[in-house]
């Protein structure tokens, strides 16, 4: 089991709120940045905007889970 960096599409979970005359962007109630002009954003590290979508870079589990390596399916144990 290992962790890989992966870009996750969070576009549908990003919301905007006007604060001090600027549009602040939030993901899961955490401020992730601001819109600076049309289709231009200042985003917190770990977030990006590409092809009109917002992405979050996260650690994702990859590979086999070691606890399931030596299973004996014929005898029904794992």
Curated annotation (Swiss-Prot):
Q: How is this protein named in the record?
A: Uncharacterized protein YusG
Q: Which Pfam family is an annotated match for this chain, by its short name? A: DUF2553
InterPro entries on file: Uncharacterised_YusG
Q: Which gene encodes it?
A: yusG
Q: Which domain of life is it from?
A: Bacteria
Give the originating organism: Bacillus subtilis (strain 168)
């Amino acid at each position: 089991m290992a962790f890989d960096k992966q870009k996750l599409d969070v576009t549908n979970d990003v919301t905007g709120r006007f604060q001090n005359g600027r549009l602040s962007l939030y993901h899961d109630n955490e401020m992730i940045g601001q819109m600076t002009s049309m289709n231009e954003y200042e985003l917190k590290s770990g977030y990006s905007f590409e092809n009109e979508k917002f992405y979050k870079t996260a650690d994702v589990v990859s590979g086999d889970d070691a606890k399931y390596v030596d299973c004996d399916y014929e005898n029904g144990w794992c």
